[in-house]
């Protein structure tokens, strides 16, 4: 079972990807993680990617797909995998699709965790973090006992730049321009499954499993 996770930043797709991977005992593959692993291990593909990254350039889609195919060819992927963070654009999806087709392979499901923008903004701008011990909170859902203070270590909590409302809105704009078209791409291939991501995490997960096992 080869699965791609789609959804806006903050939709919870990373959490769901991990839960799916745990249930089916298949790898949860993040392109960021495999880039780092290849660079750390000094592989030829990793060094090629590092050359682009060191110059502040984006790694070309063809190279990203090569690194990805190298990962999914490993023994632990023989029963499937969950892809998280790739593809993000139509050109990336097309390169991946072409490469998989040449291997007589394909994506079985694209799960779109659908959450309206206003919910995403509320979710992300309500996050608070402790830089000292790494604990995370949410002012509405998981508030600290004392406002602005970490329960665990007593340090001050901060709103990370990534979670500021303006940053979140900018990320959503990029998502709608670049990644939203993937929904049409995978709908046309007959593999897209839409799931309401506004519900409780376990309910979202149960609905995803129902789609995968229908």
What residue ranges belong to the model's regions?
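Glycine-rich phosphate-binding loop of ATP-dependent small-molecule kinases
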Residues: 1-214
């Amino acid at each position: 079972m080869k699965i791609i996770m789609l959804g806006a930043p903050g939709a919870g797709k990373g959490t769901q990807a991990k839960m799916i991977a745990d249930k089916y005992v298949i790898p949860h593959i993040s392109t960021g993680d495999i880039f780092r692993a290849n660079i750390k291990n000094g592989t030829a593909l990793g060094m090629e990617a590092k050359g682009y990254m060191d110059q502040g350039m984006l790694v070309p889609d063809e190279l990203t797909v090569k690194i990805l195919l190298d990962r999914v060819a490993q023994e632990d992927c023989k029963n499937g995998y969950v892809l998280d963070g790739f593809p993000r654009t139509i050109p990336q999806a097309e390169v991946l699709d072409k490469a998989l087709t040449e291997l007589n392979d394909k994506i079985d499901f694209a799960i779109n965790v659908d959450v309206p923008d206003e919910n995403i903004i509320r979710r992300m701008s309500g996050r608070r973090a402790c830089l000292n011990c790494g604990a995370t909170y949410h002012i509405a859902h998981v508030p600290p006992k004392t406002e602005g203070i970490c329960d665990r270590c007593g340090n001050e909590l901060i709103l990370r730049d990534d979670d500021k409302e303006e940053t979140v809105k900018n990320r959503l704009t990029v998502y709608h321009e670049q990644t939203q078209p993937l929904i049409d791409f995978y709908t046309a291939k007959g593999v897209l499954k839409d799931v309401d991501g506004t519900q409780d995490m376990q309910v979202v997960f149960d609905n995803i499993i129902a789609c995968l096992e229908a």
